[in-house]
Amino acid sequence: MKIAIASDHRGYPTKQELIKYLSKKNYEVLDYGTNSTDMVDYPEYAFKLGESVANKKVDFGIVVCGTGIGISIACNKVKGVRCAKVDNIKEAELTRKDNDANVLALNGSMPLYRVKDIVDVFFNTNFTNVDRYINRINQIKEYENNNVTKKFEEKEVRNDA
């Protein structure tokens, strides 16, 4: 299995530990950055990873930031990505079984033993292929296909203070 992984500066230590852990389990791991604890903005890394998942260059992705929230929001802007911010093994199981999530977002402050358990459950749980879940995913895909474009005409967010 091929896994993409990315983080911001706060998720970097956890990302590095996960790379070692996954490599020992014989996963092929592609690191999309960042490469240090120097402060960075997570969207750049989330978008790169999301594109690799959406384009089927990898089977799954893992993103890590301080809370897992911001980087998951950024990942979910990539068409075809279903990124779930997960805090426990039950959520890891359900997001795969019910939502067919293809990217796992983690809190960089979470204990490593918990992170490893969550990752193991996420990768070892299959989508259930139940009609109601398939229908929900298809509704999301249809919305993406009809409403999400590569470039938006929105004004850039600015802080004029």
Positions of PLM-derived features:
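Glycine-rich phosphate/diphosphate-binding loop of Rossmann-like nucleotide-binding domains
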Residues: A4-K24
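C-terminal binding/interaction regions
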Residues: A6, R10-P13, I89-A161
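Structural motif
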Residues: A6, Y32, V64-C65, V86, ...
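Short amphipathic alpha-helical segments
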Residues: Q16-I19, I73-K77, D117
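A short beta-strand-loop structural module common to alpha/beta enzyme folds
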Residues: E28-M39
